[in-house]
Amino acid sequence: MSFGQRLAEIRTGFDRPFWVANFTELFERVAYYGTSAVLAIFLSEQLHFSKELTGWIMGTFGFVVWFLPVLGGTLADRFGFRRSLMFAYLVMTVGYFLLGSLSAPWMEGARRALTDRWLVLGILMVPALGPAVVKPCVAGTTARASRENVRSIGYSIYYTLVNIGGTLGPVMAWLVRKPLGLGIENVFRVAALSVFLMFLVTLFFFREPNHPGEHQVTSVAAALKNMFVVLRNFRFVLFLLIFSSFYIVFWQEFVSAPLFLRGYVDPNANADLLLSIDAFTVICFQILIAYVTRRIPAFAAMTLGLLISSLSWLILALHPTTAGFIAALVVLALGEITQSARYYEYVSRLAPPGQQGLYMGYAFLPIAIGYFIAGPLGGYLLRYFGDVVHQPQRMWWVVSGVGIAGTLLMVAYDRVFKPGQGQGLGTGG
């Protein structure tokens, strides 16, 4: 097939809902990552929460964001993608706006009625509901609004836009906070404006994709039943728990790294802007690393990615400088690229025959579990090594140790369980 023919297939292979849904996903990711880039700083420096409380709140928020898509896909199927997206964007608009209005006079009553920690946590649970619905809607639209011959390209476009949003979100936060001088609270308000505009885009331009043979509605009760079916698979659950160690290491980027940089390296550092380095590195090197690792077995690639990301924080332990922070994020991203694409391939092979779709729905659970642990762990390590031991850079040895322990457990797991023929660390396929 010629390049011109392939280009023609791409031009005609996607229906309008595909482009609208992915366009809105880009701005939703800008809002999410912009918020995430400044959230720890906002809680610690502006609300004066302790490091441990900051970590606990962020861990809870991240867990809800990444766990709820289990049910979010069910709701999207039942109510339709259009209504679900509109609901999600409105919910996020309200949540981000409330977060940016904590110091407003009209919030005085809520601040008096609740302690700050419970008020903030309650408000954060509102925008946390949004991604749980947006993710399955956009992924489902990509499947239904693209022809079979270009569907893989559709998913590549989807993941690329997610990473572009991950790059632009922290940049947006920095622009609002620094050059415009509007402060952190207005970062949340800009995030609210961003997702509200996507509500309007969905309202006026998105139409329900209705390709036959692709739509399967599952009840909430059935989704919960399926969850228990999956969780009874000991081998699968054990793998998810072990691989959660990657995300315990990874989420320190948003939990403890910004506080470490501003608290112990440079109090004026633009931590939010620097957090764009991870996603930008992914965009730049994804194709190259995919090519280099194409012959490495899926499990070996995942284990290697975990090891690389774990070692990344040792750079900051040995060189606690802004340059060390940047280098650590680049290496962290390289590890993320190495494992991410092969992870879903491996999960599909772990699933029993005929249950690949069901198991893939739970592939993101390590992300949620990792965030839930990463938050409190990062907060504790910051307080202990920073305020008690007065050697804050030593915390990164512990973070790296968690990842290295996870790497060793992955090797042990691979020696005990061989999911499918030739899926061990030392075999091809």
Regions found by a protein language model. Name each.
Residues 65, 152-177, 194-195, 362-376:
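Glycine-rich segments within core transmembrane alpha-helices of 12-TM secondary carriers
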Residues 113-114, 175-193, 380-404:
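A membrane-interface helix-boundary motif in multi-pass transporters
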